[in-house]
From Swiss-Prot:
Organism in which the protein naturally occurs: Sphingopyxis alaskensis (strain DSM 13593 / LMG 18877 / RB2256) (Sphingomonas alaskensis)
Protein name (Swiss-Prot/TrEMBL): Small ribosomal subunit protein uS4
Keywords per UniProt: Ribonucleoprotein, Ribosomal protein, RNA-binding, rRNA-binding
BP-aspect Gene Ontology terms: ribosomal small subunit biogenesis; translation
SMART domains according to UniProt: Ribosomal_S4, S4
Gene designation: rpsD
Family: Belongs to the universal ribosomal protein uS4 family.
GO MF terms held by the record: rRNA binding; structural constituent of ribosome
One Pfam family recorded for the sequence: S4
InterPro entries assigned to the protein according to its UniProt record, in alphabetical order: Ribosomal_uS4 (IPR022801), Ribosomal_uS4_bac-type (IPR005709), Ribosomal_uS4_CS (IPR018079), Ribosomal_uS4_N (IPR001912), S4_RNA-bd (IPR002942), S4_RNA-bd_sf (IPR036986)
Length: 203
């Protein structure tokens, strides 16, 4: 198991949930935190603890993006019209690495980020290596010729546990971003609570 895979599954164990819905997640066998004392960590959490956990889970789901980036998204969401929590989800789902993952071009959000950073992803025909770039409705996301032949792309497209969301139109290795989704439309394997993230940052 690679170091990145180990870190990913460590997050699953810490949360006690199968964050990405992967069959090989260790929490499918046990539902407690990592380490020899993981089973002892249950108990009533404070409001702060609940809010922090919600933030860690949402941030971790998107490849454990940095706190700086995540808070920047929150601040932008809070300045937009409408519900801040819904706005935050919309911004996260507009990230280029998230779109590559949602389109089933890669099996994990981590490999999606790597594919982007290595210059294998194009937005409207122009190469883009910025994983945090926000796409907009109507944008077309495609893979370069070299990426189209990668085994991980074929693996991702064959994964039965992941469905294509309705806010993406996907044809092979081409995806069109149709619209910004609401929380209910995003196919999270676990419950996400952006309202608690808003409460965390509003303290």
């Amino acid at each position: 198991m690679s170091k990145r895979q180990s870190a990913k599954y460590k997050l699953d164990r810490r949360m006690g949930e199968n964050i990405w819905g992967r069959p090989k997640s260790p929490v499918n066998r046990r539902e407690y935190g990592p380490g020899q004392h993981g089973q002892r960590r249950k108990g009533k959490m404070s409001d702060f603890g609940i809010q922090l956990r919600a933030k860690q889970k949402l941030k971790g789901y998107y490849g454990d993006i940095t706190e700086k980036q995540f808070k920047k998204n929150y601040i932008e969401a809070s300045r937009m019209k409408g519900d801040t929590g819904q706005n935050l989800i919309g911004l996260l789902e507009r990230r280029l690495d998230a779109v590559v993952y949602r389109a089933k071009f890669t099996p994990t959000i981590f490999s999606a980020r790597q594919l982007v950073s290595h210059g294998h992803v194009y937005v409207n025909g122009v190469k883009c290596n910025i994983a945090s770039r926000l796409v907009k409705p109507g944008d077309e996301i495609t893979l370069g010729k070299k990426a189209q032949e990668m085994a991980l792309v074929a693996e991702a497209q064959s994964l039965p546990e992941r469905d294509l969301p309705e806010y993406l139109a996907v044809d092979g290795t081409k995806a069109t971003y149709v619209r910004v989704p609401t929380l209910d439309e995003v196919p999270y394997p676990v419950k996400m609570e952006p309202n608690l993230v808003v409460e965390f940052y509003s303290r």
